[in-house]
C-alpha cells in the first residue's frame, strides 16, 4: 500500500512539473515533434 502511494505521488509530481514546463514555453516545436 505504501509503494502505491509513493508511486502515485511521484507520477503526479512529475506530471505537474512537465505541464508547468510545457505551458511555460510556447509548444510550437514540441507539437511538431510529437505529431
Swiss-Prot record:
Cellular location(s): Plastid, Chloroplast thylakoid membrane
GO cellular component, one term: chloroplast thylakoid membrane
Membrane-related topology note: Single-pass membrane protein
Entry superkingdom: Eukaryota
Database matches in InterPro entries: PSII_PsbT, PSII_PsbT_sf
Keywords: Chloroplast, Membrane, Photosynthesis, Photosystem II, Plastid, Thylakoid, Transmembrane, Transmembrane helix
Single GO biological process annotation from the record: photosynthesis
Transmembrane segments: 3-23
Family annotation (Pfam families): PsbT
UniProt key word Lyase: no
Subunit structure and binding partners: PSII is composed of 1 copy each of membrane proteins PsbA, PsbB, PsbC, PsbD, PsbE, PsbF, PsbH, PsbI, PsbJ, PsbK, PsbL, PsbM, PsbT, PsbY, PsbZ, Psb30/Ycf12, at least 3 peripheral proteins of the oxygen-evolving complex and a large number of cofactors. It forms dimeric complexes.
Family, similarity comment: Belongs to the PsbT family.
Role description: Found at the monomer-monomer interface of the photosystem II (PS II) dimer, plays a role in assembly and dimerization of PSII. PSII is a light-driven water plastoquinone oxidoreductase, using light energy to abstract electrons from H(2)O, generating a proton gradient subsequently used for ATP formation.
PANTHER family xrefs: PHOTOSYSTEM II REACTION CENTER PROTEIN T, PTHR36411
Protein name: Photosystem II reaction center protein T
Species name: Houttuynia cordata
Amino acid at each position: 500500500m505504501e509503494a502505491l502511494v509513493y508511486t502515485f505521488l511521484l507520477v503526479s509530481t512529475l506530471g505537474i512539473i512537465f505541464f508547468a514546463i510545457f505551458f511555460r514555453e510556447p509548444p510550437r516545436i514540441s507539437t511538431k515533434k510529437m505529431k
